[in-house]
Amino acid sequence: MGERNLDGTVSVKATINKYGQKATRSVIKSSVAEDLHKSGRELGIYRESRRVAESAKAKAEVELCKAKKIVKELTLRIEESNRRLKSRRIDIEAVMNESRIDGNGGYVRIMRELEDMKQELSKLKLDVVYVSREKVVAEKEVMELESRMEENLKLLESLKLEVDVANEEHVLVEVAKIEALKECKEVEEQREKERKEVSESLHKRKKRIREMIREIERSKNFENELAETLLDIEMLETQLKLVKEMERKVQRNESMSRSKNRAFERGKDNLSVLKEVTEATEAKKAELASINAELFCLVNTMDTLRKEFDHAKKETAWLDKMIQKDDVMLERLNTKLLIAKDQLEAVSKAEERISYLADNLTTSFEKLKSDREAAKKEELKLREEARIINNEIQKTETGFDGKEKELLSKLDELEKAKHAESLALEKLETMVEKTMETREMESRRNSTITISRFEYEYLSGKACHAEETAEKKVEAAMAWVEALKASTKAIMIKTESLKRVSGKTMLEEERESFRMQRSLSIKRLVQDEIQKFKGNSEDNGLINSPKPVRKSVRLSGKFAPVQGGKSRRYSSGNRATPTFFVIKKKKKVPNMVKFFSRKRRNSSLEQ
């Protein structure tokens, strides 16, 4: 196993090599520096990955907010269209009621309302086109969001791989922790052995010091005895000097025999005393020589003992320093072990949070997939319904065109018939005036007026023909009214279909907004968990505070901001009106009134 724990800390074996086996410190420092560089690089890579993930999350949040705004605008527009449809429906119902009440007099209003309905239909078509465009844009945004979700899933996979790597590192760290504890126990045992050895050596040295002190005391006693013997030797030397002077006096006074004899006897006595004294002095000198030799040996032993004592002091000081260094190293190792424990706890908590977040993200992604499939199915259904509605609208438009053509042809026929009737009426009026004048002339002459059978039959046939034409005109008017009713019914059907489509689109948009809000809530939870993990890591002093990257750094390219479409407003003064139909309406309806009034006049004249 390597000699490195978390954060590049040197293991216990390295410390043993450092102090027990006399390993060099430069190698250990270089290995620690390399480990620190490696850990710094790994932290930089992890910070960059976190910054990239945070930037991607910020982008996704911004885009989700934009999509929400677009959905809100679309819902507002659909609500406005629904309100317009409701108001138009109420107006149509009011017009229908008025047409039922007014009868023929409400045709003009009905035609105007039909024009207004056509204008509203054109507006609704434009709104449908605009909504379809916005829907396409929203689908594109949904596709982009899906691509971003795939990118986020890739990031999740990379995070899972990092979590697996972290788990492996966690296992390695635990193994290193176990080995470090074993090494700590071994170091403590070695320290106890060293302490015992040092205590034994100190006890032995104390015993030696005591023996040396005793020998020093003995040497002091010997010195005192030597001093006393030296004093005795000096006394004896003075006595010898006196004896020598006495011998000189004896040699000078040889004249006196008695005195000589006495002195000789005394001299003999003194010589015997001197011999004894010289013998004693020689013995004392021998003792002094032996004592001096012993003193010299004692001095040498004292010097050796002093040297050993100084060496023992130095060794004890060195051992104290080593013990202090060992204590400092053990304290450092304990602090590093505590830091490693805290880091392991933080990593385990982070792994639990990341696993929880990964589970939440997987569940949310599965829900989004299911929602996406449901949305796709609903989109297919809505597209089919939109196709059916478009087909119905085209059919109704073709029916409108055919009915308009039929109405125009019938109106042309009515105009021709009116023109022919007007010519016939003019001829009849001229004929009537002429006959009236002739008959007045004849009545002045005679009281009776004679009419030929041909005239009678002609007049009766004309009356029948006029009745038939009047009936045809009434039938045409009734058909026209029925066509108007059918057109109003078709318009009502279209409005109901548009309401259904708008209601479905509103439901879809509400579902999409709910999904977006749910995804936003999930992403906010993820961001809160990441920020909590970030704060814990910053409190532990493991990770520096990364700068927020929210502008330029992007994962999958730059995303242009989606501009919210402005709602279109149509002014009532610029409404497009079909010119030919309005002109004919303005011209033909009064002609119909005139025609029916003339019909009534003719019927009154015939009566």
Swiss-Prot record:
Keyword Lyase in record: no
Coiled coil segments of this chain: 66-295, 329-445
InterPro entries, A to Z: Web
Keyword vocabulary terms for this entry: Coiled coil, Cytoplasm
Gene knockout outcome: Deficient chloroplast response.
Top-rank taxon: Eukaryota
Pfam families reported in the protein's UniProt record: WEMBL
Record-level GO BP terms: chloroplast accumulation movement; chloroplast avoidance movement; response to blue light
Tissue expression per record: Ubiquitous but preferentially in chloroplast-containing tissues.
Subcellular location: Cytoplasm
GO CC term, one of those recorded: cytosol
PANTHER family named in the record: HEAVY CHAIN, PUTATIVE, EXPRESSED-RELATED-RELATED, PROTEIN PLASTID MOVEMENT IMPAIRED 2
Protein purpose: Required for the chloroplast avoidance response under high intensity blue light. This avoidance response consists in the relocation of chloroplasts on the anticlinal side of exposed cells. Acts in association with WEB1 to maintain the velocity of chloroplast photorelocation movement via cp-actin filaments regulation.
Oligomeric form and interacting partners: Interacts with WEB1.
Family indicated by similarity: Belongs to the WEB family.
Protein's name according to its UniProt entry: Protein PLASTID MOVEMENT IMPAIRED 2
